[in-house]
From Swiss-Prot:
InterPro entries: SAICAR_synt/ADE2_N, SAICAR_synt_PurC, SAICAR_synth, SAICAR_synthetase. Pathway: Purine metabolism; IMP biosynthesis via de novo pathway; 5-amino-1-(5-phospho-D-ribosyl)imidazole-4-carboxamide from 5-amino-1-(5-phospho-D-ribosyl)imidazole-4-carboxylate: step 1/2. One of its GO terms (molecular function) is ATP binding. Keywords: ATP-binding, Ligase, Nucleotide-binding, Purine biosynthesis. This is Phosphoribosylaminoimidazole-succinocarboxamide synthase. Gene3D superfamilies: ATP-grasp fold, B domain, Phosphorylase Kinase, domain 1. It catalyses: 5-amino-1-(5-phospho-D-ribosyl)imidazole-4-carboxylate + L-aspartate + ATP = (2S)-2-[5-amino-1-(5-phospho-beta-D-ribosyl)imidazole-4-carboxamido]succinate + ADP + phosphate + 2 H(+). One of its GO terms (biological process) is cobalamin biosynthetic process. Its EC number is 6.3.2.6. It comes from Bifidobacterium animalis subsp. lactis (strain AD011). Belongs to the SAICAR synthetase family. It comes from the Bacteria.
Amino acid sequence: MQKLDKLYEGKAKKLYATDDPDVLWVEYMNQATAGNGAKKAQIEGKGELNNQITSVIFDLLKARGIDSHFVKRISDTEQLVRKMDMYPLEIIMRNTAAGSFAKRYGVEEGTALDKPILEFCVKSDELGDPFINDDGIVALGIASEEELDEISRQARAVNDALKDIFSKIDVQLVDFKIEEGKTGDGRILLADEITPDTCRLWDLKDGSGQIEHLDKDLFRRDLGNIIPAYEEIYDRLVKLAEAEGVERAE
């Protein structure tokens, strides 16, 4: 597999074409951002950890019957993925009140929600990733009703699977955001990444009841170095994959 021209560079990843028209080459970067890029820093080792974490999570999800764009990890910071047409949506699942949700509704952070909440935002830094409802998504032609039904179904299935995965490593899955895309043959699949950059993860191991962040809130809120937290998540996930006999794509 040959890496060809760079197609895109975002806040955390670079995307390249390959000599296979159906496969893209992803390189994870060390840049950390918050507030739609208003806060930035280079953090040594972050790209490698996120590449490793998302790879093992996609493997764990596949073992639970959830397919994705992920093909395989090919180096410390790189992986191959299926080429897809992406829906310009951030798909957010919330299990516990935290962050902007808690502020928006005046709910104490850490309050358990009676049922998981599915939210959508238009993926646009220029517009500030505005919220959009189901009718708006269909009316603007972002996705058809049938596509949106499938995206929503998959988001809830991913949430159920991730809650199972993280509960087994003593981590509370507070919320997360994902993206979805459509393959050339019309399949809608989970895409982008699932890492502590895109999830809120609270440690349950010490049993103190105090919130111990294992995610990008450490950077976002100036609470400390993210690297030890990301390393801890990766180590626990690898042990789970080994215990479950999950086949690794690398």
